Regions:
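Short beta-strands and strand-loop turn motifs
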Residues: 3-6, 42, 83-90, 118-120, ...
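Active-site acidic/histidine proton-transfer and metal-coordination neighborhood
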Residues: 11-118, 214
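N-terminal glycine-rich cofactor-binding segment that shapes the pocket for flavin-like pterin cofactors
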Residues: 1-3, 12-13
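Histidine-acidic metal/acid-base catalytic patches
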Residues: 15, 36-38, 73, 98-220
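Short, flexible segments with low predicted structural confidence
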Residues: 3-5, 50-51, 74-78, 149-150, ...
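Feature marks short, surface-exposed loop/turn motifs that line or immediately flank catalytic pockets
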Residues: 7-10, 46-50, 94, 124, ...
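Residues at structural and domain junctions
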Residues: 7, 54, 61, 88-91, ...
Length: 220
């Protein structure tokens, strides 16, 4: 098993909700050994009280960042206790909405237990895909050494998230960047229905065939 999801809203405006999420994270971390993994994936959350995947104007206020640091500090204490790694995703609707903020979080926390899940589709808001090369290159320049896992889904220029191969994400550039720093971790299909699996697998196999160097690295 590559990882388990410990996702909860680390930025929920209700402190009790944040504490409950941390409590559940502790239970999950304690079970990781039996589950056969040492990686727990997280999102950094949003001030939206109803939907942790919806942006909120208060995500960018200084108090929100301080709340995130407090939640992450406690989460990393749990990670240290159970000897697991926490891997967060930069995501446009969360407080860590960009690779730049992801780098800031890593630098603020200074923990070997904190790493990154790279999900290229999460880095683009509506209308931003024409700048994909610039955005992807910057993301890997800032985060490459801390990436332990990659997600494979897709996004349209409207901002709609879809299964891999059904959107407009520059997968050649995405895989080229993964290849460029010698990534050998898992690349996991994400955000798709059962009926979409076959098509997305075929799409990725084609792309990985084109990116032969990456395929060879994964085969070692």
């Amino acid at each position: 098993m590559a990882a388990v999801s410990g996702t909860f809203n680390m930025m929920h405006p209700n402190p009790r909700k944040r504490r409950d999420g941390l409590r559940r994270l502790g239970l999950l971390a304690g079970a990781c050994g039996q589950l056969g993994t040492s990686v727990i994936t997280l999102c950094t959350g949003t001030r939206d009280p109803e939907d942790m995947w919806r942006s909120h104007p208060e995500n960018d206020v200084p108090e929100a960042w301080q709340d995130l640091l407090a939640s992450m500090e406690r989460a990393l204490e749990i990670a240290e206790e159970y000897e697991v790694t926490l891997a967060f995703e930069p995501e446009v609707n969360n407080v860590v909405a960009s690779a730049e903020k992801g780098r800031r979080l890593l630098d603020d926390m200074q923990s070997s237990r904190l790493k990154v899940v790279m999900d290229a589709a999460n880095l683009f808001r509506e209308g931003e895909l024409p700048h994909a090369e610039e955005v992807l290159d910057e993301a890997f320049e800032l985060l490459d050494e801390d990436v332990v896992m990659a997600h494979a889904k897709d996004v349209k220029n409207t901002g709609e998230v879809v299964a891999a191969g059904r959107g407009e994400l520059d997968y050649d550039r995405y895989l080229e960047n993964l290849r460029g720093f010698g990534f050998e971790g898992p690349l996991i299909l994400h955000n798709l229905e059962e009926g979409e699996v076959e098509g997305s697998v075929a799409f990725l196999r084609t792309k990985l065939g084109v990116n032969a160097t990456y395929s060879e690295q994964r085969g070692r």
